[in-house]
Amino acid sequence: MSERRRPRWLAPATLLTGVVAFIWLMTEENSLWSVLSLGGAGAALGALHAQHAYALWSRFRRGLRAALIGGFIGGGTILAAVGLMFLKTATHAHLVGDYTLEQMLGMAARLPVWAAAGILLGTAISLFESR
């Protein structure tokens, strides 16, 4: 079986997401929607990069591979969001941070739920594709 090539848009999309994240770090904006969107974009792009590392995924069946990638995206979204929340709070020298420790820990506590949701969504997509 031949190795699938990376799409041409993957590297520019990754670069654009990084630029948007750095611009977001400089702004005075602290909504959870934006940090989850950036975290989700980063996790999805990371999963796409990992999916094209063919030797890593070739030994898994298609359904298991989709579930693992879904779990990676779900859990990675929360991990990336918490990391971005920490970076934004650490880089801004405010008396009161953009995100509190309670918000960051609350977000991290949702990691198993988001990973499970990603696994279920990945499995569902795999079932629809197999028809």
Map each language-model feature to its residues:
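Juxtamembrane/disordered regions of integral membrane proteins
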Residues: 1-131
